[in-house]
Design a protein with these regions (language model features):
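Bacterial Sec-dependent N-terminal signal peptides
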Residues: 1-25
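Carbohydrate-active catalytic/glycan-binding domains of CAZyme proteins
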Residues: 23-570
Length: 570
């Protein structure tokens, strides 16, 4: 009996030691880039890793993140950072919602970075969309980036650029084939690019229509490994049936043999209630030690199998394994995603030594003391001239009451940052002296031109009104609540929105030493992402069509994902 107890004691002791050892292993969490950063493409230069994402109608566009450990990522710049890059055929001035920059690829070759991508622009609602495929280059990923070179005669979206060992450069894209076998069938095509002009030359080759008769074969990437070319694509559409497929060939022009075990990554076989869904649109990178990793997009299952953040960037390990089938003449090596489970996990131990800070701030406070806007602040479309500045009122972000409104397809005066967690607290302090009916400014939480929350001050019938306006896509904008402030409003107000659980709570106070007053409570599902982008939290000013030279001055913008309880006015 004593022997058994001794063995049991030793077993428990070893288990405790193992548990403590595991507890000390540094871990990181997916998504690695939180907020609406979909369609990731990754490249490595030495020990540095870079990811670029789709940006759609937002400006600056093509956000670029950097990391040394594949877990901690820092936004270092944008590929589209000048108005001159985004006019004419590259129109991001009045681009439609869910249009704009789709699915880029980033690559490094001979001392230069390349980004190739598509601007989807629909001139009018009833007209066909134009697919403008283009290339930009830079010697430094932080910029500046070149003006776009449009690749003429390139149909489809989601282009890829591939540099082969023989010096040739190839464009790989997708299109809708003639005589499709089923509705939504896509096809991957390839053509050589002139290395100087970046224009298509030579014969066009049609490579693959996908593995499982899934719709919308897109997002191609080609890799060369051990003498074989591997074609990785997305299939099934960017929702619950999204998936990653792969094929291989010993010739870049094909024919390509599909992996019998496709899809190699998906959540289509998992419960709709798994923590992440819609995974797909992947890219891979080889580490210096020969290991591989894959990045892809996914949607967190936060509420109703969706989230405000939309499609975010995830990472997972990949292991190459040779086919064991003795009867096959050619036995390919294929990438196996997360080999032990085949699905994306929420937490991983670090793939590489930790070289960046692992501190993740739960609070960001912007006081606008500098003479520049932080890199993570973006506009919906290229902003109008003289929409804002940091010099008119020192220490304030001054936003002018321009005529366009939030419902219009133009660069109305909004600036904000991506929402990164479901629960948050956002607040601002605003100095605003509206004098003309229609002048309006305050907090704006937005998904699209037709899906937003405005918690702001508006001049109506010669009165200053605090209002909550909601557009939840199901109906026209409604004023959920309004309050004539009268003499209590002395051109200064603090606004706060707290998102927690199933509710949004809206607070205000007239002076910084006042207690907060609860203005209204709503459901939290108003901004669930149904399009290509995630929610943004920011600031807004308009004159609602009236000519105005007035402005609102914002002193502080504060965003917290972990916050203390409020002291409320009874």
């Amino acid at each position: 009996m004593k022997t058994k107890l001794k063995i049991l004691y030793i077993g428990l002791l070893l288990s405790l030691v193992n548990f403590q050892a595991l507890a000390q292993i540094p871990m990181f969490s997916n998504p690695i880039i939180k907020g609406g950063y979909p369609d990731p493409s990754i490249c490595r230069v030495g020990e540095d890793y870079y990811i670029v994402n789709s940006s759609f109608e937002y400006f600056p566009g093509l956000p670029i993140h950097h990391s040394k450990d594949l877990a901690n990522w820092t936004l270092i710049g944008h590929g589209l950072h000048r108005k001159e890059q985004c006019t004419g055929r590259m129109n991001l001035v009045d681009v439609q919602s869910n249009g704009g920059i789709h699915a880029p690829t980033i690559r490094y070759h001979n001392g230069k970075f390349y980004i190739i991508t598509t601007n989807v622009y629909q001139p009018k609602k009833d007209e066909p969309a134009q697919m403008i495929n283009f290339i930009i280059t830079a010697s430094n990923p932080e910029g500046p980036w070149s003006d776009p070179t449009i690749v003429e005669g390139a149909p489809g979206i989601d282009p890829h650029i591939f540099f082969d060992d023989d010096g040739k450069i190839y464009y790989i894209g997708n299109h809708a084939p003639e005589n499709p076998n089923f509705q939504g069938e896509g096809e991957i095509w390839m053509q050589e690019l002139d290395s100087t002009s970046f224009q298509l030359v030579g014969e066009r080759h049609f490579l693959w229509r996908g593995a499982c008769q899934g719709t919308w074969a897109e997002g191609p990437h080609i890799y060369k490994k051990d003498g074989y070319y591997y074609l990785l694509i997305a299939e099934g559409g960017t929702s619950f049936n999204h998936a990653v497929m792969i094929a291989a060939s010993n010739n870049i022009t094909g024919p390509y043999d599909a992996n019998d075990r496709n899809p190699i990554l998906s959540t289509r076989h998992l419960s709709y209630d798994y923590w992440i869904n819609s995974t797909g649109h992947a890219d891979m990178v080889e580490l210096p030690n020969g290991e591989w990793r894959m990045v892809c997009l996914g949607i967190r299952n936060e509420k109703n199998r969706a989230s405000n953040m939309g499609r975010e960037t995830l990472i997972l390990p990949v292991k190459w394994e040779k086919e064991p089938y003795w009867w096959k003449e050619i036995k390919y090596n294929w990438p196996v995603c997360n080999p032990t489970t085949g699905k994306i996990e929420k937490n991983y131990s670090y793939f590489l030594p930790i070289k960046d800070s692992i501190y993740v701030p739960t609070q960001r406070e912007y006081e606008f003391q500098e003479n520049y806007i932080p890199k993570n602040w973006t506009h919906r479309r290229v902003p109008l001239e003289n929409s804002y500045d940091l010099t008119t009122n020192s220490g304030y972000l001054t936003m002018y009451c321009k005529e366009p409104t939030i419902k219009e397809r133009t660069g109305y005066n909004f600036i904000g940052i991506k929402q990164k967690e479901t629960n948050f607290e956002v607040s601002t302090t605003m100095r605003f002296d509206p004098t003309l009916d229609g002048e309006e400014a305050g907090l704006c939480l937005i998904q699209k031109d037709d899906n937003y929350l405005l918690f702001d001050v508006k001049r109506e019938d010669k009165e200053n009104v605090l209002q909550l306006v909601i557009n939840d896509k199901k109906k026209n904008p409604i004023i959920k609540k309004d309050l004539v402030m009268g003499k209590k409003f002395k051109n200064y107000i603090e606004l706060k929105v707290i998102a927690k659980g199933n509710t949004y709570q809206y607070y205000f106070r007239y002076q910084s030493n006042d207690l907060w007053e609860l203005f209204e409570t709503t459901n939290s599902d108003i901004l669930l992402s149904e399009g290509y982008t995630g929610a943004h939290l920011g600031l807004y000013a308009t004159s609602n069509g009236t000519k105005s030279i007035n402005f609102a001055a914002f002193d502080v913008f504060k965003l917290e994902y972990s916050y203390p309880p409020l002291k409320l006015k009874k």
